[in-house]
């Protein structure tokens, strides 16, 4: 298969674990807390206190969903309570993340396998206000997908910032043992120019091909490369041994057979 294996896919599906991994790598992430649905049901005041310690606005996100489903922006206690009700309807674990005022979103994809990782150009989506909803991502322009969204490629940011984002993207790609194409999303605080890693998408819309095209990699070439990496991964898997002959295990198996007789 052409996409990530178990490790990258699992981390990419869990926003709470994902953020913990990014933090452990020393990457800049937005302040956050998390809770279980049962905590909110039993002691909403305690969860609210943790959220308000971050300071509004905050984003409330189901841990295991994508495409902005169940995500809400809370600017006060009333909207936070509403956001929690929405998120809890979708998941039992909820991420509560500090929000930025009018952040600049930057995305960067990466293509590779193993030690090989090629970062794409950076893009800046420009057709959003608070964040892209599910409909904005997939229903705009006749449902043609993410490639149809308005964006600036390359992103109009300093070269040093571009290189930093590309370096982070490659670092994340390798740490999570990714394969194929992934996309890592970032935010820049326009007030401080601080950069934050947001999340990784292990199966990005349209394979983020539009981020590689300006580099001279056509969609056909991208697909060919995905197939090649998938084959390379299979070859490497077949080179590994998955069986271990053990006298102890043999005796245990023989003993089990004797008992059955």
Task: Indicate residue ranges for each PLM-predicted region.
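ATP-dependent carboxylate activation and anion-phosphoryl transfer catalytic cores
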Residues: 23-26, 156-261
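Active-site nucleotide/adenylate-binding loops and adjacent lid/helix of ATP-dependent enzymes
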Residues: 10-97, 101-102
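Phosphate-binding site of ATP-dependent enzymes
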Residues: 75-152, 156-160, 167, 195
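Short small-residue beta-strand/loop micro-motif enriched in glycine and branched aliphatics
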Residues: 3-4, 67-68, 205-210
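Short, acidic/small-residue loops that bind anionic groups at enzyme active sites
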Residues: 1-10
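A short acidic/small-residue loop/turn micro-motif
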Residues: 37, 125-127, 203-205
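Hydrophobic beta-strand scaffold residues
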Residues: 1-2, 29, 58, 219
């Amino acid at each position: 298969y052409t996409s990530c294996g178990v490790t990258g896919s699992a981390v990419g599906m869990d926003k709470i674990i994902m953020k913990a991994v990014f933090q452990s790598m020393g990457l800049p992430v937005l302040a956050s807390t998390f809770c279980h649905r049962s905590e909110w049901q039993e002691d909403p005041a305690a969860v609210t206190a943790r959220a308000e310690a971050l300071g509004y606005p905050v984003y409330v996100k189901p841990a295991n969903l994508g495409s902005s489903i169940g995500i809400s922006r809370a600017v006060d206690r009333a909207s936070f309570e509403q956001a929690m009700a929405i998120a809890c309807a979708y998941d039992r674990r909820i991420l509560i993340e500090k929000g930025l005022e009018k952040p600049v979103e930057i995305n960067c994809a990466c293509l590779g396998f193993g030690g090989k990782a090629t970062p794409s150009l950076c893009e800046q989506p420009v057709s959003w206000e608070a964040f892209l909803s599910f409909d904005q991502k997939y229903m705009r322009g006749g449902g043609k997908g993410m490639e149809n969204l308005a964006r600036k490629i390359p992103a109009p940011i300093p070269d040093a910032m571009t290189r930093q984002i590309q370096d982070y993207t490659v670092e994340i790609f390798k740490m999570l043992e990714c394969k194929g194409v992934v996309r890592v999303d970032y935010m820049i605080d326009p007030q401080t120019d601080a950069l934050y890693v947001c999340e990784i998408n292990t199966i990005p819309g349209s394979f983020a091909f539009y981020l590689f095209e300006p580099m001279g990699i056509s969609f056909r070439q991208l697909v060919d490369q995905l197939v090649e990496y998938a084959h390379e991964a299979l070859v490497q898997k077949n080179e590994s041994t998955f069986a271990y002959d053990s006298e102890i295990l043999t005796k245990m198996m023989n003993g089990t057979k004797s008992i059955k007789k």
